């Protein structure tokens, strides 16, 4: 099986960037919808969708 890294590498970079940005945002937020440990687990365990869920559902509106 030959892996085309030209197609996969941008997705890996996107996933890592989203996860890091979401984790930093989760840590810095004073209040979230649900416990922070739960959001950290979702961000880390559910690729690409976890960080998107945090930004759409997890953050409290100011």
Curated annotation (Swiss-Prot):
Keywords, comma-separated and alphabetical: Cell membrane, Membrane, Transmembrane, Transmembrane helix
Pfam families linked to this entry: PLDc_N (PF13396)
Subcellular location: Cell membrane
Major localization listed first in the record, in broad terms: membrane
Highest taxon above the source species: Bacteria
Keyword Cell cycle assigned: no
UniProt xrefs under InterPro entries: CLS_N (IPR027379)
UniProt key word Transmembrane: yes
GO cellular component: plasma membrane
Membrane topology: Multi-pass membrane protein
Membrane-crossing segments per the record: 7-27, 37-57
Function in brief: Together with YxlD is important for negative regulation of sigma Y activity.
The protein, known as: Negative regulatory protein YxlE
Species of provenance: Bacillus subtilis (strain 168)
Lineage, uppermost ranks: Bacteria, Bacillati, Bacillota, Bacilli, Bacillales
Recorded name of the encoding gene: yxlE
């Amino acid at each position: 099986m030959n892996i085309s890294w030209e197609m996969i590498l941008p997705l890996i970079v996107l996933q890592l960037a989203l996860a890091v940005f979401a984790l930093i945002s989760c840590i810095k937020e004073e209040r979230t919808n649900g416990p922070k440990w739960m959001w950290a687990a979702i961000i880390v365990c559910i690729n690409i969708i976890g960080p998107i869920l945090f930004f759409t559902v997890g953050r409290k509106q100011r």
